[in-house]
């Protein structure tokens, strides 16, 4: 504990009235005016911390996904920041995520139009998109990536490079234990070398 020698009060250790003894890094002991700390538990601050914790807890199951989709952009921390900015709804303590507004990837690669997803048989789904409406600079070598999130089980599946842009359709099989589950689905595109992605696009929910 810092000690300050006062010509009036003698040796002062810790707080004395409105003053407190403090020690600088250079070893000098001084007497400073005591300032009460700002209340860290105001209603507004508690709401902010609760919101932040909610988003972290909710997205933690997608941590490995964001290591891929936001690689070099801050990964999980970037995903949390985007969710806080665009996808959180409700007021403290009753927050929720609007998954239709969740951004799962970002970049300058072209996306696609007229996105649909539908169950076929078992736990297989068919995803369709239209590339012909895009500028000619949308590359035929671009890869398609699909994201499926089982909110009830808190499990996410990323199917990377599962088709090429011109295919305009793909059927994929999801885990058998997901039968009957409601899934959130997204699509994004990436260059052939994986160096850049498109902005993710929410397709819709689909029940297996």
Residue ranges and their predicted role:
Residues 1-111:
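Long, polar/Ser/Thr-enriched low-complexity segments
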Residues 74-208:
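Charged linear interaction tracts used for macromolecular binding and regulation
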């Amino acid at each position: 504990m810092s000690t300050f020698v006062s010509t009036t009060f003698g040796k002062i250790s810790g707080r004395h009235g409105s003053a407190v003894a403090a020690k600088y890094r250079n070893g000098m002991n001084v007497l400073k005016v005591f300032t009460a700390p700002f209340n860290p538990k105001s209603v507004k601050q508690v709401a902010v911390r609760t919101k932040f914790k909610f988003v972290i807890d909710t997205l933690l199951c997608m941590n490995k996904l964001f290591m891929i989709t936001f690689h070099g952009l801050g990964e999980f921390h970037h995903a949390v920041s985007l969710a806080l900015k665009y996808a959180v709804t409700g007021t403290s303590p009753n927050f929720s995520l609007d998954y239709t507004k969740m951004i799962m990837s970002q970049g300058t690669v072209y996306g696609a139009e007229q996105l649909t997803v539908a169950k076929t048989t078992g736990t297989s789904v068919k995803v369709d998109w239209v590339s012909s409406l895009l500028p000619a600079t949308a590359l035929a070598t671009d890869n398609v990536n699909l994201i499926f999130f089982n909110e009830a089980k808190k499990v996410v599946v990323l199917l990377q490079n599962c088709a090429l842009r011109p295919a305009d359709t793909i059927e994929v099989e999801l885990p058998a234990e997901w039968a009957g589950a409601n899934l959130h689905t997204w699509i994004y595109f990436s260059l052939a070398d994986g160096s850049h992605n498109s902005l993710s696009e929410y397709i819709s929910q689909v029940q297996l």
